[in-house]
């Protein structure tokens, strides 16, 4: 069941992504901003519903396929992703989208602030990644950097 809020000409929909997006027509969305579960980051059940990384990435790839289907040719995608699977996520995105940039959000009051940093065995992430992409328009052409080889 979807919860819908209308603000002026915008409609915000809170629903299961894969269920709802399948109801949308092709090339009908200008912008997708999504913050899917990161898998094994939070203790809640919704973030741990997959059997392993491969299972999670298969689910995310299904989402990406639907994003590509509904996104207009000049549309944009902003996908928030956790640090652990950011590389895998980007590689999957590049199969369908032209990844334009990585946005690194430095979180001033992230959960790392209250942790015992001395007891950690790795650096605790103080940032969040956002992958910015556009609809794939054909075979990828490496852009010239303007320098002669």
What residue spans do the PLM features occupy?
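Core catalytic lobe of class I
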Residues: 2-149
């Amino acid at each position: 069941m979807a919860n819908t809020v209308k603000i002026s000409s915008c409609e915000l929909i809170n629903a299961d992504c894969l269920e709802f997006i399948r109801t949308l027509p092709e090339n009908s969305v200008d912008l997708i901003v999504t913050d899917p579960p990161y898998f094994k980051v939070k203790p809640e059940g919704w973030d741990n519903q997959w059997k392993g990384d491969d299972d999670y990435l298969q689910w995310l790839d299904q989402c990406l396929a639907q994003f590509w289907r509904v996104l207009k040719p000049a549309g944009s995608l902003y996908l928030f992703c956790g640090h652990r699977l950011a590389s895998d996520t980007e590689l999957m995105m590049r199969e369908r989208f032209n990844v334009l940039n990585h946005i690194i959000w430095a979180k001033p009051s992230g959960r790392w602030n209250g942790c015992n940093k001395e007891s950690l065995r790795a650096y605790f992430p103080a940032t969040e990644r956002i992958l910015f992409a556009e609809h794939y328009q054909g075979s990828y052409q490496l852009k010239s950097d303007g320098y002669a080889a």
